[in-house]
Amino acid sequence: MHPKVQSLLSKFPRVELIPWETPIQYLPNISKLVGADIYVKRDDLTGLGIGGNKIRKLEYLLGDAIIRKADVIITVGAVHSNHAFVTGLAAKKLGFDVVLVLRGKEELRGNYLLDKIMGIETRVYEAKDSFELMKYAEEVAKELEEKGRKPYIIPVGGASPVGTLGYVRASGEIAEQGNRIGVNFDSIVVATGSGGTLAGLSVGLAILRKETRAIGMAVGKFGETMVNKVEELAKATGEFIGVKNLKLKIELYDYSFGEYGKITREVAETIRLVGTKEGVILDPVYTGKAFYGLLDLAKKGELGEKILFIHTGGISGTFHYGDKILSFL
């Protein structure tokens, strides 16, 4: 961990859920294909449940919940949400009760199946988006408060200044690893949904005064609102930490193929390509889309010579979309 980042974050409560540094792996075959050195930060190996980026955020979110003496954790997401499942699992591990407020079709596959196997309470609503789901989450919290409980609501994707600290911390880990292997990354690429991972990386890189670009590949609804959301979250995180006038470098590209969860031939072929060339398995909702974006931009020379892709996990989502993926292969 970089000492500057460690010093700034030491005042915030954190519960350790990741007992190791996730590795950075060079991808020689993909590198030859695109004409640049491609590395992957294996945050799919964060160690709890199915792994993934959300666990970094949960270290701070659940640490905050403990300090606030909460006894039940509420979070929101789609029925097949990686975030919702690992939140439920981590919270149960730490002794909390959990309620997942979800939207979508109830099918016993993927993460929803795992929710049920683990005995995590789920409530499924008809909601058009996560903002509407948050209203239901607030209703659940009020119901629990009336019963004398102390609920703690985690927003979609853990995207809050508290949760974003997880990727400020990760930026310090990446900086130290880069120093050890003698690589200064030109770009760090990550799938972007709720925006917390990209925001945290941009803040961490700014604190470290790195020239490395933080690049998000949007996997859902894209537009000026999304860009503003990430920028606002990054600024709020900087203020929360107590660091002013950060020179944030945030870039966001649209590789959603029109909507969140839409599977296309390009995504399916990217999953197969990376799996067969490097033995790394991507998912169809986040990393498959984001890596397709990386390949597209890297081939055009737009990401520099040294590129790091953060594998944010989500393997269980592959099983939810199996039929769609296979229809393109």
Curated annotation (Swiss-Prot):
Alphabetized GO MF terms: 1-aminocyclopropane-1-carboxylate deaminase activity; D-cysteine desulfhydrase activity
Statement: the UniProt record of this protein carries the keyword Hydrolase: yes
Modified residues (N6-(pyridoxal phosphate)lysine): K54
Keyword terms, alphabetized: Hydrolase, Pyridoxal phosphate
InterPro entries xref list: ACCD_DCysDesulf, D-Cys_desShydrase, TrpB-like_PALP, TrpB-like_PALP_sf
SUPFAM superfamilies per the UniProt record, alphabetical: Tryptophan synthase beta subunit-like PLP-dependent enzymes
Cofactor(s) demanded: pyridoxal 5'-phosphate
Name of this chain's protein: Putative 1-aminocyclopropane-1-carboxylate deaminase
Lineage, top ranks: Archaea, Methanobacteriati, Methanobacteriota, Thermococci, Thermococcales
